[in-house]
Amino acid sequence: MAESEKEAALPPKEAFSDWYNELLWMAEIMDVRYPVKGLYVWYPFGFAIRRNTYSIIREILDNSGHQETLFPLLIPENEFMKEAEHIKGFENEVYWVTHGGKDPLDIPLALRPTSETAIYPMYKKWVRSHADFPLKLYQIVNTFRYETKHTRPLIRLREITSFKEAHTVHATWEDAEAQVKEAIGLYTEIYRRLAVPVLRSRRPDWDKFPGADYTDALDAVMPDGKTLQIGTVHHLGDNFAKTFDIKYEAPDGEQRYAHQTCYGISERSIAATISIHGDDKGLVLPPEIAPVQVVIIPIIFKKGAEEVFAACKDVQERLKKAGIRVEVDASDLRPGAKYYKWEMKGVPLRLEIGPRDLQNNVAVAVRRDTGEKDQITLLEIEAGVRLKFEAIQKSLYEKAGSELESRIFDCVDLDEVKEKIQEGVATIPWCGKRECGLAMEDHIGAGILGIPLTPRSKGKEKCPACGEETETRVYVARTY
């Protein structure tokens, strides 16, 4: 990208939609100019954010008994069409491969919108005994959905380039339920590492995953007050096991159907991270996922330039040996232009080293998240930088948590809900009846996210739709 383009002004974050679209380009995360609607190209810098984010996901899954695998992209139509309720949820979104070259295929092949119907025929072959449980596999793949709504990079795509889907198999319904709870905990930890606080809720029956007994989900509240679904966990019961004949031999020798779960995270995790933490200057990245964690800016005068450059290179090498991703900006740009460039890219920490700093054996450290400036002794630069990273991570999470709480409103009637969802998320009593939930959604003009997994009960209240007493409150929000 040319320097003149990089110097273009980023819209203010309060104009969130414009800010988001421009930031993806100006910070070199994604290029939207690919000639197919809903398909986008990762810039190398953006892909490095993706790589670091998915490294966290892999680490957390691998350390909890999951194993990574890879299944084919193409799903035969006869397998795809087996689970009727599941297909109802996806049939209008499927891309079909109907020809090989110029020859029609005997069996059309679906590009996976999700992989249950690709994986479970193999699970039928692999699962034999109760000793095989729990089976916990995951893959990180691209999936395709023919989105007819307005597409948006990282948020609503026709090609989801980074879909992490886990699929587990268990002996009993209760074992699968325990896995759902574990998965929610794992996802919460992933987002803690990204400094993104989440809402956790159980979706209403009409919004659960097609073919599931129930769905739990994680949502982030975006700067415009809308919620973004950033993780889902589905208890599949034995529904898919019956469809795909996944049985196991129990300890008593009896053949029984297995119980399953599946859960997914996509690049929406990155959309939430950059949206929640970013500011009017550009990205603000948690240190763990920043492609460049530290940028060193030499402050050059006529005298002492060689010594300053040498000191900057020395600090760079020391930080690299400590496992820190670091760059020295020795370009001909003015210091102000360098600050602009690296602030746009969200580099967590800037170190400035000039002749006077060398005399005092220090570097000036500037935090990207707060702009706070102080000094770190060069003798202990590695430890000093690590302490800054810890402080940045803690500050980002606490700030985002406070912002989230300020956007949750406990309401008493539907008109108040209608008003408050323009700012964030409302809670309202609900008796649990489907007809009441749908009537409330219709009145409000927004959806019920679900019942909070950590209840927000205020004692006995009345359902605003029917007047029945209830102690349950639900989240209501505008959604992406």
From Swiss-Prot:
Any one GO biological process: prolyl-tRNA aminoacylation
Principal subcellular localization: cytoplasm
Entry's family note: Belongs to the class-II aminoacyl-tRNA synthetase family. ProS type 3 subfamily.
Biological role stated in the UniProt entry: Catalyzes the attachment of proline to tRNA(Pro) in a two-step reaction: proline is first activated by ATP to form Pro-AMP and then transferred to the acceptor end of tRNA(Pro).
SUBUNIT field: Homodimer.
Keywords: Aminoacyl-tRNA synthetase, ATP-binding, Cytoplasm, Ligase, Nucleotide-binding, Protein biosynthesis
Compartments where found: Cytoplasm
Protein name: Proline--tRNA ligase
Broad class of enzyme this protein falls into: ligase
One Gene Ontology term of the molecular function aspect: proline-tRNA ligase activity
Organism, scientific name: Methanosarcina mazei (strain ATCC BAA-159 / DSM 3647 / Goe1 / Go1 / JCM 11833 / OCM 88)
Cellular component annotations (GO), alphabetically ordered: aminoacyl-tRNA synthetase multienzyme complex; cytoplasm
Domain writeup: Consists of three domains: the N-terminal catalytic domain, the anticodon-binding domain and the C-terminal extension.
UniProt cross-references to PANTHER family, sorted A to Z: BIFUNCTIONAL GLUTAMATE_PROLINE--TRNA LIGASE, PROLYL-TRNA SYNTHETASE
Gene it is expressed from: proS
EC number(s) from the headed UniProt entry: 6.1.1.15
Catalytic activity: tRNA(Pro) + L-proline + ATP = L-prolyl-tRNA(Pro) + AMP + diphosphate
Pfam families linked to this entry: HGTP_anticodon, ProRS-C_1, tRNA-synt_2b
